[in-house]
Curated annotation (Swiss-Prot):
Pathway(s) where this gene product acts: Amino-acid biosynthesis; L-isoleucine biosynthesis; L-isoleucine from 2-oxobutanoate: step 3/4; Amino-acid biosynthesis; L-valine biosynthesis; L-valine from pyruvate: step 3/4
Gene name linked to the record: ilvD
GO MF, any single term: magnesium ion binding
PANTHER family in UniProt: DIHYDROXY-ACID DEHYDRATASE DAD, DIHYDROXY-ACID DEHYDRATASE, MITOCHONDRIAL
Phylogenetic lineage: Bacteria, Bacillati, Actinomycetota, Actinomycetes, Micrococcales
The protein's name in its UniProt record: Dihydroxy-acid dehydratase
Active site residues per record: S488 (proton acceptor)
Cofactor binding: number and manner: Binds 1 [2Fe-2S] cluster per subunit. This cluster acts as a Lewis acid cofactor.
């Protein structure tokens, strides 16, 4: 037992779970098993800490995690705990994009959460350091911490350095993975040749780390800092940077200290912490996937967060970070000018951050920021609030007759406040890609892709392949794309996703026909189909049959809830 320094406090058991496998006659067999992996008589009083990693060598996003897990283990040992490492899955969105594999991406978030819960409960671990690098593994780990309500610290793998390419014309430029998707569209439109396409392919991923812009992985790493679930400053250093090893060691130490103080994940994951995270996402112009993931993490933490909270905060918080996919800079540049603490500090100075929330350091956000003293925005990568990129946040929730339960737009990329045009309707993404390849997409159209929602997809695929192809073909500012699916954090152009209710649930999007006029008003948060509701509902509807009748996607389609609730299961 650990006696709190507070004389009025109760004793805190730093082995709240693992005592059942280390103490007493009944634990003879489990102790024998644990001796075989290195534990001994001197270790039975130590808390057992899981080191949960989504390491694999399928994708560069996760390559650093084995190294970081070693640092976390050393930190746990140094603080008086005993680390026990295990792995879970991770799906690469970059590899699974544009084909059947993308159905499994969002599903992997739930599998990760369930698998971490399974191991921690089965092995009676007391706390956990959570390590992740690819898009869905970050929220999956945070959801697990919230569900289990154990002492937990999250550490990000870090992002990749940008690549550099010189094209045949002599132009040299910085590139990220998103440039390759757009280059495919440009090649199909005859705007570049295969030689330049190959040059871009070879340049986009120069080493280890997650995709470098303010795409989903970097957005969720920033969210983890803002929630207080990661050590401040740990989101922005590049994957190969040895500061990450220091953060890994400190994360291992921190989780043991949280146990000693009796602080668990839900002590940190309060409503105020989620409001801080939303403010940071809005200021960064982060990925629309953050809406889904924050709703899901809040659900696991039993925090009453709703989709409407995003507009309440986004309408007050300006967009100040000039980051890709719409801006000029990447996460390495954020690190160069002081990291996410600079953004949190700026928000706190303007009254947009709750400074009294607790963090994994055991101290408040305000105390941590004061100690780090991160400085002010540089004015280029991160603007001041006196000269923001946009006066409101980078994400907007829209509602109207097309999406009564909501839709999500990344307004950081919208040059057009109002867009109105005739619908071109496609059941699923492939049909839209075929129409684009055939040159059948017309300027001024509203492309509607449906039956791609959480249940109808199933899996709510990201539409990066089609949006990048639209931009690459030169139509990026001339058409609007709407879907009950979702978009990659790297998506650019006029795109609105997460339309709810989805088509398979007989939402209005299911009844839209070619030629129906659709109007989107970003300023008024409106999204409407200009057809009388009775007329719309009277239309004959023949939904496509279920895509999967067995396996994980069949199970998922029966359990998953609306995107407006975070696509939770």
């Amino acid at each position: 037992m650990f006696m709190s320094s507070d004389a009025n406090a109760c004793e805190i058991d730093i082995k709240p779970r693992s005592r059942v496998v280390t103490h007493g006659i009944e634990a003879t067999t489990s102790r024998g098993m644990l001796r075989a992996v290195g534990m001994g008589d001197a270790d039975w009083e130590k808390p057992q800490i899981g080191i949960a990693s989504s390491w694999n060598n399928i994708t560069p996003c996760n390559l650093s995690l084995d190294r970081l897990a070693q640092g976390a283990r050393e930190g746990v040992h140094a603080a008086g705990g005993y680390p026990l490492q295990f792995c879970t899955i991770s799906v690469s969105d970059g590899i699974s994009m544009g084909h059947e594999g993308m159905h499994f991406s969002l599903v992997s978030r739930e599998v990760i959460t369930d698998s971490v819960e399974t191991v921690l409960m089965a092995e009676a671990l007391d706390g956990v350091v959570l390590l992740a690098g690819c898009d869905k593994s970050l929220p999956g780990m945070l959801m697990a911490a919230a569900r289990l309500d154990v002492s937990a610290v999250f550490l990000y793998a870090g992002s990749i350095a940008p690549g550099y390419v010189t094209l045949k014309c002599g132009e040299s430029k910085e590139v990220t993975i998103i440039d390759s998707f757009e280059a495919v569209g440009a090649y199909k439109a005859g705007l570049i040749d295969q030689d330049d396409l190959g040059r871009i392919e070879r340049a986009i991923c120069p080493g280890e780390g997650a995709c470098g812009g303010m795409y989903t992985a970097n957005t969720m790493a920033s969210v983890a800092e803002a929630l207080g679930m990661s050590l401040l400053g740990s989101a922005s250093p590049p994957s190969a940077d040895r500061r990450r090893d220091v953060y890994a060691h400190k994360s291992g130490e921190a989780v043991v200290e949280l146990l000693k103080r009796g602080i668990t994940a839900r002590d940190i994951l309060t409503k105020e912490a989620f409001e801080n995270a939303i403010a940071v996402v809005m200021a960064l112009g982060g990925s629309t996937n953050a809406v889904l993931h924050l709703l899901a993490i809040a659900h696991e933490a039993h925090v009453p967060l709703t989709i409407d909270d995003f507009n309440k905060i986004g309408n007050r918080v300006p967009h100040i970070a000039d980051l890709k996919p719409f801006g000029r800079y990447v996460m390495n540049d954020v690190d160069r000018v002081g990291g996410i603490p600079v953004v949190i500090n700026a928000l706190m100075r303007e009254g947009f951050i709750h400074g009294d929330v607790i963090t994994v350091s055991g101290r408040t956000m305000a105390e941590e920021i004061s100690d780090i003293n991160p400085g002010l925005p540089d004015g280029k990568v991160i603007h001041s609030f006196s000269s923001p990129l946009h006066p409101t946040g980078g994400i907007k929730v829209l509602k109207g007759t097309l999406a009564p339960d909501g839709a999500v737009a990344k307004t950081a990329g919208f040059d057009t406040v109002v867009f109105q045009g005739p619908a071109m309707v496609f059941d699923r993404e492939r049909a839209a890609m075929d129409a684009l390849s055939a040159g059948n997409i017309k300027k001024g159209s509203v492309i509607v892709i449906r039956y791609e929602g959480p249940k109808g997809g199933p899996g709510m695929r990201e539409m990066l392949a089609i949006t990048a192809a639209i931009k690459g073909s030169g139509l990026g500012k001339d058409v609007l794309l709407l879907t009950d699916g979702r978009f990659s954090g790297g998506t650019t152009g006029l795109c609105i996703g997460h339309i709810a209710p989805e088509a398979v649930d007989l939402g209005p999007i299911a009844f839209v026909q070619d030629g129906d006029i659709i109007r989107v008003d970003i300023e008024k948060s409106g999204i409407d189909v200009l057809v009388d509701e009775k007329q719309l509902r009277a239309r004959h509807l023949t939904p496509p049959p279920p895509r999967y009748t067995s396996g994980v996607l069949s199970k998922y389609s029966k359990l998953v809830k609306s995107a407006s609730l975070g696509a939770i299961t």
